[in-house]
């Protein structure tokens, strides 16, 4: 009798057939330390039929790249909004941020941003010619002399 009482029940696993408490699920985004949804990007990769197979790290890497690009564009657009004394980013600020940055401008060269406008640019040929130092001295000399009386 004592031997049967001394034996204990088998320990329960973490979920599964033996029941017991389940572990709280942790998303792939949290594991990777990202804000962008890794699971959703994996689903889009599968649904899009871009390849027959892809590795388990591919959606994580893609989510990290997209998150980095979004953070970069938003930081530059926020700076553009602050320069214009605005608290809200609008399409104009996005356009200015992308076109003024060399690398982002090259990446998004063929992209049209709705309501973004264009970069302010005046061709140097159309600008008024700057007066040289000699012509400005001649103007000063003629301005200081009194006109001759006729």
From Swiss-Prot:
GO BP term (any one): heterochromatin organization
Domain notes: Contains one SPKK motif which may interact with the minor groove of A/T-rich DNA sites. Phosphorylation of this motif may regulate DNA binding. This motif is reiterated in both termini of histone H1 and in the N-terminus of sea urchin histones H2B, but its presence in the C-terminus seems to be unique to plant H2A.
Location of the motif SPKK motif: 146-149
Gene3D superfamilies reported for this sequence: Histone, subunit A
Disordered: annotated segments: 1-28, 130-150
Functional summary from the UniProt entry: Core component of nucleosome. Nucleosomes wrap and compact DNA into chromatin, limiting DNA accessibility to the cellular machineries which require DNA as a template. Histones thereby play a central role in transcription regulation, DNA repair, DNA replication and chromosomal stability. DNA accessibility is regulated via a complex set of post-translational modifications of histones, also called histone code, and nucleosome remodeling.
Main location as per UniProt: nucleus
Residue positions where Phosphoserine is found in the record: 146
Keywords, sorted A to Z: Chromosome, DNA-binding, Nucleosome core, Nucleus, Phosphoprotein
SUPFAM superfamilies assigned: Histone-fold
UniProt biased composition (Low complexity): 1-12
Subcellular localization, as worded in the UniProt entry: Nucleus; Chromosome
Summary of subunit composition and partner proteins: The nucleosome is a histone octamer containing two molecules each of H2A, H2B, H3 and H4 assembled in one H3-H4 heterotetramer and two H2A-H2B heterodimers. The octamer wraps approximately 147 bp of DNA.
Composition bias type Polar residues, residue spans: 131-150
Source domain of life: Eukaryota
One Pfam short name: Histone
Maturation and modification: Not ubiquitinated.
Protein name, as recorded: Probable histone H2A.5
Sequence similarity: Belongs to the histone H2A family.
């Amino acid at each position: 009798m004592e031997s049967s009482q001394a034996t204990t029940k088998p320990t329960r696993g973490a979920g599964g057939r033996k029941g017991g408490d389940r572990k709280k699920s942790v998303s792939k985004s949290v594991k990777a330390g990202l804000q962008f949804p890794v699971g959703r990007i994996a689903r889009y990769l599968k649904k899009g039929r871009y390849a027959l197979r892809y590795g388990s790290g591919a959606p994580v890497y893609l989510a990290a790249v997209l998150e980095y690009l979004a953070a970069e564009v938003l930081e530059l657009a926020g700076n553009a909004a602050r320069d214009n004394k605005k608290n809200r980013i609008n399409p104009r600020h996005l356009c200015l941020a992308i076109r003024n940055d060399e690398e982002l401008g090259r990446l998004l060269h063929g992209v049209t941003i709705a309501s973004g406008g264009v970069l302010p640019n005046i061709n140097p040929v159309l600008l008024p010619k700057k007066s040289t130092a000699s012509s400005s001295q001649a103007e000063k000399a003629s301005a200081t002399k009194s006109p001759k009386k006729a």
